Amino acid sequence: MSGNTLGTLFTVTTFGESHGPAIGCVIDGCPPGMGLTEADIQFELDRRKPGTSRHVTQRQEADEVEILSGVFEGVTTGTPIALLIRNTDQRSKDYGNIVETFRPGHADYTYWQKYGIRDYRGGGRSSARLTAPIVGAGAVAKKWLRERFGVEVRGYMSCLGEVDVPFVDWSHVRENPFFSPNAAIVPELEAYMDALRKDGDSIGARIDVVASGVPVGWGEPVFDRLDADIAKAMMSINAVKGVEIGAGFDSVAQRGSVHGDELTPAGFVGNHAGGVLGGISTGQDITVSIAIKPTSSIRTPRRSITKAGEEATVETFGRHDPCVGIRATPIAESMLALVLIDHALRHRAQCGDVETSTPKIAGSAT
């Protein structure tokens, strides 16, 4: 298995399995001289960790991070930063019924056919448990981007199943377990999830992420375009089945006179492009949306096959998120931050001294 590293100059290599002794990552390429403590990382991990409400998995993991290397006297040294998170609440016996069968919609079948072996305990390497190290690495990236460029990366849930969540204010997001930007709709979301849980079923969600303060110029055309790398990173998140940047699929029905964001001396008139043109950041907000499929592990019996190819019925009994999208906001934020820091360093390496006579216009003319 070789696809375990994200990035070019700022790289993150994750390791571990859902029911192994620990999970973690090694970050390489972090600039030296940045203050960094475990508390900086723990704040983000606490936003993602399981067991925080009745609407997510009841697996109780503290997700306490340990910095093993790359930091001396509270400052990054420029050497690899190793982060470790110990697993403490595994219940592997819950998965005894799928040792010989494959869960529909999961990676069980494909991992088995590719590698000839699979860790059936909680999905092993394919588990969303492995997003915790990504969030840990994302905390490092967020801190550097904020301190070096004033970049802020924030996200929220914009849709839960059939329930749209209209944006009201960023301050609402941190006040509820759904990362909803609309406090008034939270009771409806809770009732929706309660009914879903009684049905033994699951549902998907849409998450929107915004990066503000990104300067013009980040991105490496043609094959490492900023939007291409963002899409790849987002599609690397468990259960993500779609990515939109800017207007996304709505662009299909827009005319060029509408979609093309006009430029004025005062700034851009619109942002249908989502802050990226030609694979390079424009200086506007970078806007990304992801579609997350329903959790595949549900209590409703489903048809499947055994390793021998015989018919079987699968019912999952482990502790699972009825909607993985509820905890996905910090993960999507982290993925965007990791792509941005990598491109910031790549831009600095090749084009850091480039200057033009054209003034950099504002992201918005209003």
Curated annotation (Swiss-Prot):
It is an enzyme of class 4 (lyase). Reduced FMN (FMNH(2)). NADP(+) binds at residues 48, 54. Homotetramer. SUPFAM superfamilies: Chorismate synthase, AroC. Pathway: Metabolic intermediate biosynthesis; chorismate biosynthesis; chorismate from D-erythrose 4-phosphate and phosphoenolpyruvate: step 7/7. The gene is aroC. This is Chorismate synthase. Its EC number is 4.2.3.5. GO terms for biological process: amino acid biosynthetic process; aromatic amino acid family biosynthetic process; chorismate biosynthetic process. Keywords: Amino-acid biosynthesis, Aromatic amino acid biosynthesis, FAD, Flavoprotein, FMN, Lyase, NADP. Belongs to the chorismate synthase family. Its cofactor is FMNH2. It catalyses: 5-O-(1-carboxyvinyl)-3-phosphoshikimate = chorismate + phosphate. HAMAP family: Chorismate_synth. This reaction introduces a second double bond into the aromatic ring system. It holds the Pfam family Chorismate_synt. GO terms for cellular component: cytosol. The lineage of its organism: Bacteria, Pseudomonadati, Pseudomonadota, Betaproteobacteria, Burkholderiales. FMN binds at residues 125-127, 238-239, 278, 293-297, 319.
